[in-house]
Amino acid sequence: MIRKLFIVLLLLLVTIEEARMSSLSFLNIEKTEILFFTKTEETILVSSSYENKRPNSSHLFVKIEDPKILQMVNVAKKISSDATNFTINLVTDEEGETNVTIQLWDSEGRQERLIEEIKNVKVKVLKQKDSLLQAPMHIDRNILMLILPLILLNKCAFGCKIELQLFQTVWKRPLPVILGAVTQFFLMPFCGFLLSQIVALPEAQAFGVVMTCTCPGGGGGYLFALLLDGDFTLAILMTCTSTLLALIMMPVNSYIYSRILGLSGTFHIPVSKIVSTLLFILVPVSIGIVIKHRIPEKASFLERIIRPLSFILMFVGIYLTFTVGLVFLKTDNLEVILLGLLVPALGLLFGYSFAKVCTLPLPVCKTVAIESGMLNSFLALAVIQLSFPQSKANLASVAPFTVAMCSGCEMLLIILVYKAKKRCIFFLQDKRKRNFLI
């Protein structure tokens, strides 16, 4: 009888101990929602706080749902004073999605006991041999060789339309430039941070959104200013000014928001790319100004082709952005797409509202809005690629490409609506004139 009671008591104690163990969480993995793999060889780092009398008694078991997509090579184990770290080495085969289950087991003699299990860690495998900075090289070289002279010619044509007197006016009354700078470097980064926290983006993606929002004006803002009857001379001046300010404000914002997001490390600002962007605008525009004063007949020809050329470049730019960013669309989730739509829309709204409150002329209001909403997102891409390891950089780079694509689509929609409205007004006015004459 005593022996039976002892056995029952022993089983009860074991059951209580197992229940206590199952209620604890020993495994710690950096991210359990979704993992993006782009290289042939990848690793998953798992930390275990489980302790036993024998340190080597615990081990990991990894179960992969689809071995055609992902295969495990081995699991390396490293014991430290406060935790046991496991490195799961994997190789990727095909593109696709699969689920990974990770189990922590404890060996006691010939018996094994399941301590904890992390189920259904989703893994997306995207074959991408090159880095994102090399991605544009996959675009047809013939298109690039054709588009580059057209861009330079277009900037030169803008130089022919510039009135130098306007520079003096802006210098005396720099309010539009100040409004654009405040919106771009203070309000937009804060909005990007706030939105990324609301939708609970991972730290790397949130930083990508913030860096996109702290970029200077660009993205063909002067093209859209011309097509929407804004002040394109002011747009060029605002782009150049904000690009210069980016040399100071991008490092400041990257430091502030990386610390808030808990990201450590050194963030590299692509100074050479910022300067080259500035020169890429100033040199052809300056040539256009010289042509206007030295060869007026050539300048008048360039002014005539500027609108059709701007339309062509706008469509080609959207096409190239989608071509380069296609790989990122595969990794986009609903939250990132939503932010991609909101960021340019908020920039346009803030810029236009502030300019309207300051009672600026309508063309100036349009220009401030465009320069605040159309950001040079590819500078953010350069910052991310230079600052993060490749796996984290791929995740963070989704935001700049998504914002660039959404910006182009939104501006195209605005231009089409604006042109349609303008044509309807012209048609109605023409009809009224005819009725009046009759």
From Swiss-Prot:
Residues 164-174, 228-231, 292-308, 355-367, 419-438 are cytoplasmic. Glycans are attached at residues 56, 85, 99. Residues 20-142, 196-206, 253-270, 330-333, 389-397 are extracellular. Keywords: Glycoprotein, Ion transport, Membrane, Signal, Sodium, Sodium transport, Symport, Transmembrane, Transmembrane helix, Transport. Its main location: membrane. Pfam families: NTCP5_P3_N, SBF. One of its GO terms (cellular component) is membrane. The keyword Nucleus does not apply. It is a multi-pass membrane protein. GO terms for molecular function: bile acid:sodium symporter activity. PANTHER family: SODIUM-BILE ACID COTRANSPORTER, SODIUM_BILE ACID COTRANSPORTER 5. Belongs to the bile acid:sodium symporter (BASS) (TC 2.A.28) family. This is Sodium/bile acid cotransporter 5. The gene is SLC10A5.
